[in-house]
From Swiss-Prot:
Keywords: DNA damage, DNA recombination, DNA repair, DNA replication, DNA-binding, Metal-binding, Zinc, Zinc-finger
Recorded superkingdom: Viruses
Keyword DNA repair: yes
Other observations noted: Interacts with the polymerase and the uvsX and uvsY proteins.
Cross-referenced SUPFAM superfamilies: Nucleic acid-binding proteins (SSF50249)
Protein name per its UniProtKB record: Single-stranded DNA-binding protein
Quaternary data: Homodimer in the absence of DNA, monomer when binding DNA.
GO biological process, one term: DNA replication
A GO MF label: zinc ion binding
InterPro entries documented for this protein: NA-bd_OB-fold (IPR012340), Phage_T4_Gp32_ssDNA-bd_sf (IPR044947)
Species the sequence originates in: Enterobacteria phage FSalpha
Protein task: Binds preferentially to single-stranded DNA and therefore, destabilizes double-stranded DNA. It is involved in DNA replication, repair and recombination. Binds ss-DNA as the replication fork advances and stimulates the replisome processivity and accuracy.
Length: 48
């Protein structure tokens, strides 16, 4: 049913495709939740 028999083969193929770049740099466009002193987050969703 499936072409790949082991997850190691899949991981090797993904490493070859990605070039082991990973996510070392932070994305400036990524939205992050602001936390208060208690560690609770709050967000406002606005519909235009």
């Amino acid at each position: 049913m499936f072409k790949r028999k082991s997850t190691a083969e899949l991981a090797a193929q993904m490493a070859k495709l990605n070039g082991n770049k990973g996510f070392s740099s932070e994305d400036k466009g990524e939205w992050k939740l602001k936390l208060d002193n208690a560690g609770n987050g709050q967000a406002v969703i606005r519909f235009l």
